[in-house]
């Protein structure tokens, strides 16, 4: 149906500011008002007003200009003529007024009818809104509106005719604007009444015209709105039918899915691909659902709401689509999890690495943990790894940290079967798994894939049977303990490659070259930050064993500075310079070189007899004395500090991890003969170490060393070991530095300090970095002892205060349960449980306090033991000295390496590691100083056993 187009009113209603015969109407109205009935008086002659109209008679000028007294009585004929004219004019005026009133009355009634009709139709049009959100109802509304528009259109000619009549009337009878003075006056003249009628007609015509224009415009807008709504509803209805059909088809496919447990493992990749294709095939459904929802939203904005049936259908489509999405996502996740857990690259095959009652479980971040169903406990470590750590405790009797660490790592290496893996094989696996980027972060699944490929390649190359699940699980456990003790499930690729490279069965030089290449740039150069990252990763290996304190601690900045001394002032270091530094076996990396020597020495037999245990032949390391002839010691006796009565480890010793040659025997004989003519004082003045020492200091927080993984919420065993070892090393270095200058290793309580001071490899050609002349005891003993005394006094005060505080807390904890029990009897029954719970908490607190007291007591005993040894040292009388007057106390040196199979070039002689037999003679001034210090010690510690008594009393209570 074509929209109805109404034409506007073809006239413009006049505002009527003109009045063409104003004077005429003015005089006639005034005449009507003053002379409603004409009367003639002989005595008074009233001049008639002049008339402007044509043919109107005028009075004689003489009558106008003359006075009444001067004019004589009018003639009868003239009076009659004037009177007749007045009557005629009055009659015409009355006729005109009656005609005007009749004409305006005929216009007012139709205009009012039109106004009422238009108002009624406007209300009917408003009643048609809002539209219903249903196609049938909107179509019905469309037909109704079409009939409505036809009715309005048919009324148009009549309305136009009435408005044209009103226009014609107003053009004949214009009016002026209504003034306030006229509107307030009660008496209206005929002219004013005519203007009021004209004004009223004009108002009615204006209202009718505006209502007509408004109605026609609303009809057109309503027609467009209905058409637009019907179009959207038809589109929504068609889209919902199509979506419903598509969803029904998809739900049918979903119903055919088999349970995950019924699928074959080999078919999992096919099912995963099928689910992905299914998801892509039904991806257009998402766009269709979005389109339908958008159309419904647009209709709602237009105040058109879907019917109950359509709303329910749309809601069902949305619900079905969401359910289908969830089903597809869950199905895909289940298939992927099953493929990951049971597929070729999954952790499912690792479940065979444990035996009953153990079970291997996986945390949400894919980190494995182990459940003991018999003990109902869980732990991070593999049961075999726990057993391995327990066996490592047997090596704690080794006095030298580097050898103790190397021996432990050797056991770990053999348990993980990494001693059979070559670095070349490991590099191939790294390249296959795209691990070239050292900053790449690996998750547990990636680590498992790499380890699995590594051990499978080992089986192929060596032709040996390897328990791949056990080796993979154990290696993963060890890597997580070293580089991810917090079990975050992430580790850097550099960490992974460093761990594998350190324990693989390859020459140490190749390992170091490879590790340097991982942090070097394209020009084979490395800056301090990247070198620090490498050393940080490497130091994590001994840290996990609790041995990091002997290698400079976790802070690698001193080692970085030591290495960059070889860079000749450049900001980067080259590979050759790095290897030159590492060949000196720096303190932070000496354990790696010792591990290599331990590996080589395992299968070596020396055809000689141990001078202490009489073992023959000597297996492993062989230690030859360079002070006494024909004195050889096996590795067990030397590393554990055993010595016979006449063969204490007081003299320079040479270490061999390969069979000796005749040239080496001759060289050692010459060295021994030379040392026979050297005094003990010579060895005290020329100590040499078995490795390059690194000055460990507290660094600022701005170190660029990478942060390690976060710790677990509970106390980590290895971290606690590291913490205690670091603290012990720090205390010993501060408190007992002078003990190591005067006591033999057999009498020293800390073998790590012995290693740190006397095991640095230093060559004769590198004196600048290794040889540090010891300070004379005669010149610095007083200052050192005073510092130690002040430190011990502070420690003693702190411990005494802590013991007093713990004693007070302990007494409160003992009294609190008694008070709680007494009050429980007096209180109501409902408070018994609360009091008992409080008592249990207090007992637990008491246990914690007792444990802490025990720790403090042990620490106090250590300090008192050191104090007692200090007193004995100060009170010890001078012993018989040699020709030079030196004391008899001496220090044993750590082993020297043989040159047979060492990475150093053939022909270069490794220096002897020697130690002094005595500290030196004490002068009379030093004796006086020691006596003075002894007095201070007596005043500072009046009773050595006082703290023991206090602690025992607390523990007994």
UniProtKB/Swiss-Prot annotation:
Residues 358-383 form the WW domain. Residues 877-894 have a biased composition (Low complexity). SMART domains: SPEC, WW, ZnF_ZZ. Its main location: other. The modification Phosphoserine is found at residue 748. Spectrin repeats lie at residues 102-179, 231-337. Detected in trigeminal nerve Schwann cells. Detected in brain cortex and hippocampus. Detected in brain membrane fractions and highly enriched in the postsynaptic density (at protein level). A zinc finger (ZZ-type) spans 605-661. It is found in: Postsynaptic density; Cell projection, Dendrite; Perikaryon; Cell membrane. Residues 877-923 are annotated as: Disordered. It is a peripheral membrane protein. Keywords: Cell membrane, Cell projection, Membrane, Metal-binding, Phosphoprotein, Repeat, Synapse, Zinc, Zinc-finger. Coiled coil: none annotated. GO terms for molecular function: zinc ion binding. It comes from the Eukaryota. GO terms for cellular component: dendrite; glutamatergic synapse; perikaryon; plasma membrane; postsynaptic density. The modification Phosphothreonine is found at residue 910. Interacts with PRX; this enhances phosphorylation. Identified in a dystroglycan complex that contains at least PRX, DRP2, UTRN, DMD and DAG1. Required for normal myelination and for normal organization of the cytoplasm and the formation of Cajal bands in myelinating Schwann cells. Required for normal PRX location at appositions between the abaxonal surface of the myelin sheath and the Schwann cell plasma membrane. Possibly involved in membrane-cytoskeleton interactions of the central nervous system. This is Dystrophin-related protein 2. The gene is Drp2.
């Amino acid at each position: 149906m074509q929209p109805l187009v109404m034409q506007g009113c073809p006239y413009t209603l006049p505002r009527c500011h003109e009045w063409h015969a104003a004077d005429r109407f003015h005089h006639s109205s005034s005449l009507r008002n003053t002379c409603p009935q004409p009367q003639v008086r002989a005595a008074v002659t009233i001049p008639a007003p002049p008339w402007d109209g044509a043919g109107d008679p005028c009075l004689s000028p003489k009558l106008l200009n003359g006075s009444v007294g001067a004019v004589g009585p009018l003639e009868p004929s003239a009076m009659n003529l004037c009177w007749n004219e007045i009557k005629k004019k009055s009659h015409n005026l009355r006729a005109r007024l009656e005609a005007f009133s009749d004409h305006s009355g005929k216009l007012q009634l139709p205009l009012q009818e039109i106004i009422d009709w238009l108002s009624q139709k406007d209300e009917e049009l408003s009643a048609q809104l809002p539209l219903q959100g249903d196609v049938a109802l909107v179509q019905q509304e469309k037909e109704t509106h079409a009939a409505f528009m036809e009715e309005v259109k048919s009324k148009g000619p009549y309305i136009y005719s009435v408005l044209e009549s009103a226009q014609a009337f107003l053009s004949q009878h214009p009016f002026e604007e209504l003034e306030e003075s006229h509107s307030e006056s009660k008496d209206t003249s005929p002219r004013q009444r005519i203007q009021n009628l004209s004004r009223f007609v004009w108002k009615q015509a204006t209202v009718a015209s505006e209502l007509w224009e408004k109605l026609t415009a609303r009809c057109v807008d309503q027609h467009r709105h209905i058409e637009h709504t019907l179009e959207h509803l038809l589109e929504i209805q068609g889209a919902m039918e199509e979506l419903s059909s598509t969803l029904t088809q998809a739900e049918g496919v979903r119903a055919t899915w088999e349970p995950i447990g019924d699928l074959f493992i080999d078919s999992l990749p096919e099912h995963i691909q099928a689910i992905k294709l299914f998801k892509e095939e039904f991806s257009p459904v998402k766009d269709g659902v979005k389109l339908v929802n958008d159309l419904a939203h647009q209709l709602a904005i237009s105040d058109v709401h879907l019917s109950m049936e359509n709303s329910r259908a749309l809601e069902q489509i949305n619900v079905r689509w969401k359910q289908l999405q969830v089903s597809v996502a869950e199905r895909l996740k289940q298939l992927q999890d099953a493929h990951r857990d049971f597929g070729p690259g999954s952790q499912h095959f690792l479940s065979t690495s444990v035996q009953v009652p153990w079970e291997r479980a996986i945390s949400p971040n894919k980190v494995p943990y182990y459940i003991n169903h018999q003990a109902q406990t869980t732990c991070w470590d593999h049961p075999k790894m726990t057993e391995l750590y327990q066996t490592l405790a047997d090596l704690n009797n080794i006095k030298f940290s580097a050898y103790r660490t190397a021996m432990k790592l050797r056991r770990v290496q053999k348990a993980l079967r990494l001693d059979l893996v070559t670095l070349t094989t490991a590099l191939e696996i790294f390249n296959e798994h795209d691990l070239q980027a050292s900053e790449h972060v690996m998750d547990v699944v990636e680590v498992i894939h790499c380890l699995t490929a590594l051990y499978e390649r080992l089986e192929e190359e060596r032709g040996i049977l390897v328990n791949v699940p056990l080796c993979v699980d154990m290696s993963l456990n060890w890597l997580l303990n070293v580089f991810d003790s917090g079990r975050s499930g992430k580790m850097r690729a550099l960490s992974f490659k460093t761990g594998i490279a350190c324990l693989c069965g390859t020459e140490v030089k190749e390992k170091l070259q490879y590790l340097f290449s991982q942090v070097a740039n394209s020009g084979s150069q490395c800056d301090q930050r990247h070198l620090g990252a490498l050393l940080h990763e490497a130091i994590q290996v001994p840290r996990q064993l609790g041995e990091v304190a002997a290698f400079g601690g976790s802070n690698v900045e001193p080692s970085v500075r030591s290495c960059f001394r070889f860079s000749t002032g450049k900001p980067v270091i080259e590979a050759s310079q790095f290897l030159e530094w590492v060949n000196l076996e720096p303190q932070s990396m000496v354990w790696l070189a010792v591990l290599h020597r331990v590996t080589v020495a395992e299968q070596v037999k020396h055809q000689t007899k141990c001078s202490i245990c009489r073992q023959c032949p000597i297996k492993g390391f062989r230690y030859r004395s360079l002070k006494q002839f024909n004195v050889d010691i096996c590795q067990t006796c030397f590393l554990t500090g055993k010595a016979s009565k006449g063969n204490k480890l007081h003299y320079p010793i040479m270490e061999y991890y390969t069979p000796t040659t005749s040239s080496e025997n001759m060289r050692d004989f010459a060295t021994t003969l030379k040392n026979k003519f050297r005094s003990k004082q010579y060895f005290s003045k020329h100590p040499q170490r078995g490795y390059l020492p690194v000055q460990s200091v507290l660094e600022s927080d701005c170190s660029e060393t990478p942060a390690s993984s976060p710790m677990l919420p509970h106390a980590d065993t290895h971290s606690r070991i590291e913490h205690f070892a670091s603290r012990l090393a720090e205390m010993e270095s501060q408190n007992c530095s002078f003990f190591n200058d005067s006591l033999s290793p057999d009498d020293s309580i800390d073998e790590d300090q012995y290693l740190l001071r006397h095991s640095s490899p230093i060559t004769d050609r590198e004196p600048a970095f290794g040889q540090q002349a010891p300070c004379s005891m005669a010149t610095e003993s007083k200052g050192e002892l005073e510092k130690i005394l002040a430190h011990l006094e502070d420690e003693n005060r702190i411990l005494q205060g802590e013991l007093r505080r713990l004693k007070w807390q302990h007494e409160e904890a003992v009294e609190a349960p008694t008070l709680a029990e007494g009050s429980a009897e007096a209180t109501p029954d409902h408070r018994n449980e609360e009091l008992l719970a409080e008592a249990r908490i207090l007992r637990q607190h008491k246990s914690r306090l007792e444990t802490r007291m025990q720790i403090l007591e042990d620490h106090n005993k250590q300090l008192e033991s050191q104090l007692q040894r200090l007193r004995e040292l100060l009170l010890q009388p001078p012993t018989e000295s040699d020709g030079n007057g030196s004391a008899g106390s001496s220090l044993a040196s750590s082993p020297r390496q043989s040159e047979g199979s060492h990475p150093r070039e053939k022909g270069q002689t490794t220096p002897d590691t020697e130690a002094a037999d005595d500290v030196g003679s004490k002068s009379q001034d030093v004796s006086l100083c020691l006596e003075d210090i002894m007095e201070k010690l007596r005043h500072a510690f009046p009773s050595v056993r006082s703290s023991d008594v206090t602690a025992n009393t607390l523990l007994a209570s």
